[in-house]
């Protein structure tokens, strides 16, 4: 009975925070989003913004992978680069930020890089979606191959590379990638 009260209280709190999503995406959408577990690999220029967008979308659980610390030179492009966060690990700062947005969310901060040698162990958690936002060619290639072999859904993110028109961003098959040198090499 106590567990049911906690669940009802948690769902009420989540509904108050994110009820706009129900209006936007339809009845039951918040429950579906709160049941999702998303992995984000690389918490930099793209990954930091993705993590915050997911937190504000009512995702129930995220696992963040990045071993880097925040540098002052990250300020122009990375969400977590603020006075007071320089020198701190990216995943720890983003975990705190996510919990400030959505206290009921479960955030696993993994201060490690995903590499070909540790990938299988780190990816075996059964994610609903893996988002690759890292900038390592080898890791991107190996991760795409691992996800494909294991029937794991993956979203691969490219770099802005000095582009300034966000209306040109497209979600498409990697084989049809244009205007991104790193992703073009991968396809």
Each language-model region and where it sits:
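Conserved SAM-binding strand-loop segment of SAM-dependent methyltransferases
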Residues: 106-112
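Short amphipathic alpha-helix with an adjacent loop that forms part of the alpha/beta core around
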Residues: 117-126
């Amino acid at each position: 009975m106590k567990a049911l009260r906690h669940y009802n209280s948690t769902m009420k709190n989540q509904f108050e925070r994110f009820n706009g999503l129900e209006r936007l995406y339809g009845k039951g959408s918040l429950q579906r989003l709160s049941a999702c577990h998303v992995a984000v690999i690389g918490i930099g220029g793209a990954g930091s913004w993705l993590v915050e967008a997911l937190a504000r979308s009512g995702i129930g659980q995220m696992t963040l992978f990045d071993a880097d610390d925040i540098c002052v030179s990250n300020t122009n492009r990375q969400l977590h680069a603020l006075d007071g966060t320089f020198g701190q690990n990216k995943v720890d700062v983003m975990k705190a930020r996510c919990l400030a947005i959505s206290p009921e969310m479960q955030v696993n901060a993994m201060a490690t890089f995903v590499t070909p040698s540790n990938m299988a162990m780190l990816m075996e958690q059964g994610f609903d979606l893996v988002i690759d936002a890292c900038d390592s060619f080898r890791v991107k290639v190996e991760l795409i191959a691992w996800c494909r072999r294991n029937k794991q859904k993956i979203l691969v993110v490219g770099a802005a590379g000095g582009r300034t028109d966000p209306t040109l961003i497209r979600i498409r098959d990697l084989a049809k990638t244009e205007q991104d040198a790193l992703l073009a090499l991968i396809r």
